[in-house]
């Protein structure tokens, strides 16, 4: 494996190489490559998001985050269907992420619920045909981030321009990297494989219904940062209940640990560098291969932003409440939903 090829590995792949190193020299080399990868990734991400903020305005910095996330994920990940169809679908997904979150923010919670369900139905059914690719962690997360950081007026016009450019970049990178791959499915096949007896379809329906419902309840209860609860629910919903229970435990414990660590840093560090706590969290996520540790470090960035608006106490309270509510509601909802669907139609295992 070349130096460049090793740089392309994810955290789990890099840590596997480290674990299986036979000599100290080999382990030091893999450690060096891993640290270079983290450094290069952080510098690139920081530069990309900073540039997008300068061009599109500070209110649209989240556009840079969403576009960067899509490019980095879909340069390797696929949708499981023909490349040409997938490319058009990616363009459609960007349209949905640009229009629907903004439209939902203009409506009261109940009409917004319907908009969110319709939008997530397209993203999940066509973008997340293989649950184990975890494309929902890109598409639904991107949707929720844009929903949570909505803008209006001139800023929204700039957001449209930024998302259009992001769609073009993502589609070009995706097509270039996947054009020579063969896929058996097309868009019609994806629709035909929708089956209420399959574990995949049940999981998709849980995502489509539960996440918007969590957002709606959070809004009806006047809970700020409703997107946090939605993101927590999305992250916890998996095809199998045993996996969900594990995720829920790790999410709750990870967020509480993250809140404690953030609070310690908040009091130890001078106010002038509070904004950089989020970068520390980003580095931590890059070094983490396990979901529990990722939950810890993901808390840093969210709290660094929220603390500016709500203060430390308010941000910490919101983070814990929203995350516990999101994952617990998702667990209960999916347990009931899976039970009802299993009674109506026996589980059918499928090849994804």
Q: Model-derived features: where do they sit?
A:
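Alpha-helical transmembrane segments and their membrane-interface boundaries
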Residues: 2-137, 141-300, 304-352
